[in-house]
Amino acid sequence: MRTIALGICIFISSIAFAQRDCATQSYIQEQKSTNPRLSNSIAEVETFIERQKLNARLTGGGMSSAANIIKVPVVVHVLYSSASQIIPDDRVKSQVEALNRDFRRDNWDSINTPERFKSLAADVQIEFVLATSDPKGRATNGIVRKKTSIEYWKSDDKIKFSSQGGDDAWDSQSYLNIWVGNLQSVIGYSSVPGGPAEKDGLVITTSVFGTINVGGVYNLGRTVVHEVGHWLGLKHIWGDYYCGDDLVDDTPVQGNFTPGCPTTFRSSCNNGSLGDMYMNYMDYTADACMNLFTEGQKARMRSLFFDGGPRASLLYSKGLNQPWTEEAPVVEIPVPVAVLYPNPATHEITLNLDDNWVGRLARIISINGNVVSTIKITSRLQIISIGQLKAGMYFLQAESESGKVREKFIKL
């Protein structure tokens, strides 16, 4: 929504948000207040992007041919304080697959793009691949799991440092770092090009990561798609202020974020017959209502990979090479014996267990320690009705030869 200036132009361990709460804008403002040089670095990146845009107009060129598929090595840092927060490999892979579908416009719901926007919808030609080699050249599957004593993370970057209970970034010149943990108040945030290398990457709350055993309205992996957009230099579709500028030429100017999942034409800021592009990945709609990046957004993201750009070094990363040093030591990863979702919940919860639990009893215990319900487990996927419970915090507890399960959940 390139505008002509005339003057001065929550996550509560929940997946049931009224609106998508991306903390990137507030995070960047906070970073600027503590790092005076960051504003200059971000401004330099913006100058670089504008220069590439001008060069493309003058030469009619750009990195857009099918031969120029950019592959980005990815490492996912999973931080967990309880067994239910351990994300298995298939769920991590489902998130990477979701990223690639949306960035390559292979998403099945691309047919839902309104006719007026179809000519603008883009195959960004960027793909994301879990790393095969770590920074020391050892074999990896691109997934790091680490137990932590931190129960809730904030958007203060502590999750990015081992010294503060998190996990240190892999070399951000060679990898996209994604940290996954139990975020408080927000569902995700990202650094932007030009920020400190040791903080570069995105942070996503556990319950919206991936597409397997993920409930609620953010269940298609598009929180990560949205945050990767920020990591590649995109702003929110409304420009982060009323009728603002997102620095992209082909997105209509828009008054504000769009909550929920609209089904009808919406218009703001005199954007005429085009109306609001609320189905853009950089808006706040539910995952099921998002389905496109534009050609302008594509050009902006890909420009960062030109020589001298802040993401250019990723083109030369060894993260997707065959390992070149000794094998990494095998690390025992505890397999979660139970996963409970959704959390919070209103009517029912699902308990995902292994076979050892079938026939056992599970108890729901109030915060005061009283047993309020007892359930016999009859299936590996046990659906438990909680509609009769009063709103509040509860614990689900069970025991078997596999050990003891005690999971906290919120009844809304």
Describe these PLM feature segments:
Residues G216-N291:
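The catalytic-center signature of Zn2+-dependent metalloproteases
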Residues Q19-D171:
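Propeptide-to-catalytic entry region of secreted or membrane-anchored zinc metalloproteases
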Residues P336-Y341, A345-L412:
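C-terminal outer-membrane/trafficking sorting elements
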